[in-house]
Regions:
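Extreme N-terminal segment that seeds HTH/winged-HTH DNA-binding domains in transcriptional regulators
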Residues: 1-39, 43-44
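Short helix-terminating capping/connector loops at secondary-structure junctions
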Residues: 31, 137-142, 205-212
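N-terminal helix-turn-helix
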Residues: 31-69, 74-75
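PLD-like (HKD) phosphodiesterase/transphosphatidyltransferase domain
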Residues: 80-170, 273-275
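Short, flexible loop/turn elements at secondary-structure junctions
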Residues: 115-117, 217-221, 230
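HKD-type phospholipase D/PLD-like phosphodiesterase module
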Residues: 164-223
Length: 299
């Protein structure tokens, strides 16, 4: 197999995994439901069945699905947010999709986001773009500031793990670790570009009056993801460190130490009339933190 074909195969694995992940997050495949058979997915995406299998391995490694021979592939996780407000506490956990649905019901949306790759955000933005195109919501303005880790950052993850008969892989210049980080940067570039293009396209078509997107990079390895909306709400949760298989662009699968953004347990806080309440202090504190990093450290 030539190099270009191998790279293309990796891109197809990424494309299929991204699409299926978005469907799960968007509710097309609810918790406990089964994905279509692999043969059907291969036909739909116009790829080889082996590509579908590798994409499913990616989702399995992220904790979205589980597969059992003869039983199909079942969804075992959806992105949920536990609210700290009295109203939502009665309703229990809500999905991140429901949270963004409510946010985009407003005429103006101001989003400040601190994240590793913006993969989750891209999924939610695509869903809201569809709602806007379907005339289900009609916001006028969207302003997004996003903080991402600088590519020059020597982050402790992702990192290739040694096999049973291999020496320890603890050097930052280890070949597989370098390739893992290149893959991470590719994912970040893809998702941030997709977010920018999606929102600016809505503005170009007149479906948004204004779309302002600004992205800066900071030399801080994310240990949590943070969404701040309109200065009044905060959603945050820690990243989970885990060992999992990762498919590289040349389709090689390696064992690695990584974080699983989609596995975060997100908490939701809403400012109220009491500036000293736990929720109000939480939102204000994290907004101040974001602004300080944006102004003094990010480039």
């Amino acid at each position: 197999m030539v190099k270009s074909q191998e790279a293309g195969g990796g891109r197809e694995v990424f494309r299929v995994a991204e699409d299926l992940r978005a469907r799960i997050a968007g509710g097309a495949y609810p918790l406990g439901s089964f994905l279509p058979p692999q043969r059907e997915l291969a036909t739909e995406f116009d790829v080889a069945r082996d590509t579908v299998q590798k994409a499913l391995e990616v989702l399995k490694g992220e904790g979205w699905i589980e597969s059992r021979q003869g039983s199909g592939t079942r969804v075992v996780k959806v992105m949920q947010v536990q609210s700290d407000t009295a109203k939502d506490a009665k309703e229990g956990q809500v999905t991140l999709r429901e949270f963004f649905d409510e946010a985009f019901d407003a005429p103006e949306i101001v989003l400040d986001v601190y994240t590793l790759t913006s993969e989750s955000l891209n999924t939610q933005v695509k869903t809201q773009v569809d709602r806007i195109r379907d005339r289900k919501v009609a916001p006028r303005k969207v302003a997004l500031r996003m903080l991402l880790p600088a590519q020059s950052l020597d982050s402790p993850y992702p990192r290739a793990l040694a096999g049973p008969d291999e020496p320890q892989r603890d050097r930052p210049d280890d070949e597989l670790t370098v390739r893992l980080k290149e893959r991470l940067h590719d994912i970040e570039r893809h998702n941030s570009a997709s977010i920018r293009q999606s929102l600016l396209q809505l503005q170009a078509e007149g479906l948004l009056e204004s779309a302002h997107i600004e992205i800066r990079y900071v030399k801080i390895p994310p240990v949590l993801k943070l969404y701040l909306i309109n200065g009044t709400q905060a959603v945050h949760g820690p990243y989970t460190i885990t060992e999992r298989p990762i498919v590289l662009p040349d389709t090689e699968t390696i064992r690695a130490l990584d974080v699983v953004p989609m596995d975060s347990k997100l908490m939701h806080y809403v400012k109220d009339a009491d500036p000293r309440s736990r929720s109000s202090v939480f939102v204000d504190t994290w907004q101040e933190w974001f602004d300080s990093v944006w102004d003094h450290l990010a480039r």
